[in-house]
Design a protein with these regions (language model features):
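Membrane-embedded alpha-helical bundles of multi-pass enzymes
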Residues: 1-104, 293-294, 305-308, 320-322, ...
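Residue-level signal for alpha-helix termini/capping positions
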Residues: 10, 82, 146-149, 181, ...
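CN hydrolase (nitrilase-like) catalytic-core segments centered on the catalytic cysteine
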Residues: 22, 154, 161-162, 168-188, ...
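Active-site/binding-pocket entry motifs
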Residues: 51, 124-125, 216-217, 290, ...
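Soluble catalytic regions of membrane-associated enzymes that act on cell-envelope
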Residues: 103-219, 238-241, 250-255, 260, ...
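Short, surface-exposed secondary-structure junctions/capping segments
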Residues: 223-236, 353-364
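Small-residue-centered hinge/linker elements
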Residues: 245-247
Length: 391
C-alpha cells in the first residue's frame, strides 16, 4: 500500500515529496497497527530507535513522530544524493530534530521512590508445551521469590506466572499467600481464567485490584472466525477464548499507582497512555516470553519498553517468565537485565513520577493529523494526475 502512494508522490515537486512521503508512511503504519483484528504495531519503525538520537521525539508525539523523523531524514539523504543537490535538505532535517530536542522539558527530579523487585522464575523447558507444566512455572516463581534477601515495597511477577488459577485451585492460592506473607510485600501475579488474562495484586488481605489484558493477540489468545476456520482445521481450538478487559491498567501496590501493560500490550499506544492519564507513577510490562525461545522477539519487546519509558518519563519494570527481564530508567536506559532462560530477580529503587509529557497529553492526535496529511497528499496527487490525463 505504501508503494502505491509512493509511486504517485515521487512525481510531485520536491517540497510535496518531502511533506507527502513521510506522512503517507505514517498513514500506512497507522493502518497496519490498527487493522485488522486490532492491528499489529510490533513492527513500527520507532521501536528500532531505542538507542538512537531521535528517540526523544516520542515524548512530543509518540511513536508516530519518531517514524516521521526516521523516514524524513532517510528521504532527505536520498534526495540529496539522487538529485545531486547540496545537502541543504538533509541539514534542515538535522536542525529540525535538534530544535525539537531543545523543546523537551528536562525530567523532574523524583521526590519519591519505590523499591521494586522483578522476579523471573524461568520455565521447565522451551516451546509451547511448557504450558502443560503450569504447576512447575508457579513453583519456580515461588521459590525464587522466597530467596529474596531484601525487603521490597512491591514485587512484580510475569504474565502467566501462575497459570494454575489461584481462584479455583486451593493449592496454588496457598502457595501465593505463603510467599506473600514471607516477604510482607504485595505481589503482582499473572494468572488466567477461561475468559481473561489477568494481572492481580496479591497482598496480606488476599487478591485485590487487577488489570485484565485489553489488547489481545489474535489467533493465540482468541480466534477470529473460529466456527468458520474450524471447517479447515481442528487446531483452531488450541487458541484461547479470552475476552478483553476495559480497565485503564492502573493498580495500587503499597499505595503506589502502577501502570500495567501485559506483554503484547506494550506495543499499543493506548495501553500505557491510559495508565499514565489514570495516574500511574511507575510502569510495568509483565510478559510471558517463553514461546519466543532464543529469537530476537524478546529483545524487540524490551526496545518497546525502553521507548515507552522515554515517552512517559517513567521507569518501566519488565518481568518475564524466562527473560529478558529488565529495569528501565525513565530516560530509556537499561539499569539491569537478566539472561534468558535463567532463574533470577532484579531489585531497584525507582523514581515515582507524575509528569505529563506532551505525548501523554495529546494522545493519538499527532498520529491522526500526520496520517490525514499523508492521505490527503496521495489523494490530491491521484486526483491531479487523473485530471491531467483527461486534459
Amino acid at each position: 500500500l505504501f508503494g502505491v502512494g509512493l509511486k504517485l508522490l515521487v512525481r510531485r515537486p520536491l517540497t510535496a515529496q518531502i511533506i507527502g512521503i513521510p506522512t503517507w508512511f505514517v498513514a500506512t503504519e497507522w493502518l497496519r497497527s490498527s487493522f485488522p483484528f486490532g492491528g499489529f504495531p510490533w513492527g513500527r519503525i520507532a521501536w528500532g530507535q531505542a538507542s538512537g538520537p531521535i528517540s526523544w521525539l516520542i515524548r512530543l508525539g509518540g511513536p508516530a513522530l519518531v517514524t516521521l523523523a526516521v523516514v524524513l531524514i532517510g528521504l532527505l539523504l536520498a534526495l540529496s544524493i539522487r538529485k545531486h543537490r547540496a545537502p541543504a535538505y538533509s541539514l534542515a532535517g538535522v536542525v529540525a530534530v535538534i530544535a525539537a530536542y531543545a523543546l523537551l522539558i528536562p525530567a523532574t527530579p523524583a521526590d519519591r521512590t519505590v523499591d521494586v523487585v522483578a522476579v523471573q522464575g524461568n520455565v521447565p523447558r522451551l516451546g509451547l508445551d511448557f504450558n502443560a507444566q503450569r504447576r512447575a512455572v508457579l513453583d519456580n516463581h515461588v521459590r525464587r521469590t522466597e530467596k529474596l534477601e531484601s525487603d521490597p515495597d512491591i514485587v512484580i511477577w510475569p504474565e502467566n506466572s501462575s497459570d494454575v488459577n489461584p481462584f479455583t485451585d486451593p493449592a496454588a492460592r496457598q502457595q501465593i499467600e505463603r510467599v506473600q506473607r514471607s516477604i510482607d510485600a504485595p505481589i503482582l501475579v499473572g494468572t488466567v481464567s477461561p475468559e481473561h488474562n489477568t494481572m492481580v495484586v496479591w497482598d496480606s488481605e488476599g487478591p485485590g485490584e487487577s488489570h485484565v489484558k485489553r489488547f489481545l493477540q489474535p489467533f493465540g489468545e482468541y480466534m477470529p472466525f473460529r466456527d468458520f476456520l474450524r471447517r479447515f482445521s481442528e487446531h483452531v481450538d488450541r487458541a484461547g477464548n479470552f475476552q478483553p478487559g476495559d480497565d485503564n491498567g492502573v493498580v495500587h501496590m503499597n499505595g503506589v499507582p502502577v501502570g500495567v501493560a501485559t506483554c503484547y500490550e506494550v506495543s499499543f499506544d493506548g495501553a500505557f497512555r491510559m495508565a499514565v492519564q489514570g495516574g500511574a507513577q511507575i510502569l510495568t510490562s509483565p510478559t510471558n516470553n517463553a514461546t519466543f525461545g532464543f529469537t530476537d522477539m524478546t529483545y524487540q519487546q524490551l526496545a518497546m519498553s525502553r521507548m515507552r519509558a522515554k515517552e512517559y518519563d517513567r521507569a518501566v519494570v519488565v518481568a518475564a517468565t524466562s527473560g529478558v527481564s529488565a529495569i528501565v530508567k525513565p530516560d530509556g536506559s537499561v539499569e539491569q537485565r537478566t539472561a534468558i532462560f535463567t532463574s533470577d530477580a532484579l531489585e531497584a529503587e525507582l523514581p515515582l513520577s507524575d509528569t505529563m509529557t506532551l505525548s501523554a497529553r495529546v494522545g493519538p492526535w499527532v498520529e491522526w493529523i500526520l496520517a490525514i496529511l499523508g492521505l490527503l497528499s496521495v489523494a490530491f496527487t491521484y486526483r491531479r494526475g487523473k485530471k491531467a490525463f483527461h486534459d
